[in-house]
A protein has these predicted regions:
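Copper-binding active sites and cupredoxin-like electron-transfer domains
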Residues: 1-134
Length: 134
């Protein structure tokens, strides 16, 4: 296992949030190849259609081929999907988030060596260089 404390952060993007922050991960495939990709994010789930209260809860989304995109609406550090309250407009998260590093990647594992992965770092204490959401 690798540790950022020992070897430093990866060269791939490290996105940052505080636990329980409502977070939107926009995933798209801009490739011109016909290969299909599957996005995954460890420790998190989201709604297949984020604005549909009756949709499936998933932890990976496939079918990403040429020019396809989707939004994963998550609560940072939580396995509970982002919800939008009674009004359907206000993003709400439970208070069960856990600070740590969460791997996002293409679940086609042969792409890991080429850098098709990164981290979402979830903090539980205020950081001087990361403003809290309003």
């Amino acid at each position: 296992m690798f540790s950022s404390a020992v070897v430093g952060d990866p060269a791939t993007p490290v996105f940052r949030a505080y636990k329980n922050d409502p977070t939107y991960v926009r995933v798209l495939n801009s490739s011109d190849l016909g290969r299909v990709h599957t996005f995954g994010l460890t420790g998190h789930t989201w709604k297949y259609e984020f604005n549909d209260p009756n949709t499936s809860i998933i932890n990976g989304q496939g079918g990403l081929n040429t020019s396809r995109a989707f939004n994963a609406a998550i609560c940072a550090g939580s396995n509970t999907p982002l919800s939008f309250g009674a009004s359907g407009l206000t993003p709400t998260c439970p208070s069960d988030g856990i600070a740590g590093d969460y791997l996002y990647n293409d679940r086609n594992l042969f792409l890991l060596p080429s850098g098709s992965w990164g981290l979402i770092r979830v903090h539980d204490a205020p950081m001087a260089d990361l403003k809290p959401l309003p």
